[in-house]
Amino acid sequence: MAKTASPGDTAAGNGTEPLPDKYETALAELESLVARMEGGALSLEDSLAAYRRGAALVAFCQQQLEKVEQQVRVLDGATLKPLSSGTAATDGDDDDL
């Protein structure tokens, strides 16, 4: 299982940490990195390392989402339709995004 940075570690380790096995783990680590960077307590070097790690985590999460999307397309076949502008997703109901 992949090691995630604890609060006492440097911002993102030495840059050679393996990516997490799961999307949820990567997202949690990414959220933690963002919070630490927004806190402003990181040195410039740690901020750069955190940014690099964050970029790798974002790429991993995007890949995982693309894989799931492909699986959904296979399962749903031609029943998938583009999201129209009048759907609930654009009504502002989800403030967590």
UniProtKB/Swiss-Prot annotation:
Q: Where in the cell is it found?
A: Cytoplasm
Parts of the chain that traverse the membrane? none
- A biological-process GO annotation: DNA catabolic process
* Record GO terms (molecular function): exodeoxyribonuclease VII activity
Which Pfam families does this chain map to?
Exonuc_VII_S
Subunit structure, per the record? Heterooligomer composed of large and small subunits.
PANTHER family with a match to the protein in the record: EXODEOXYRIBONUCLEASE 7 SMALL SUBUNIT
Q: What is this protein called?
A: Exodeoxyribonuclease 7 small subunit
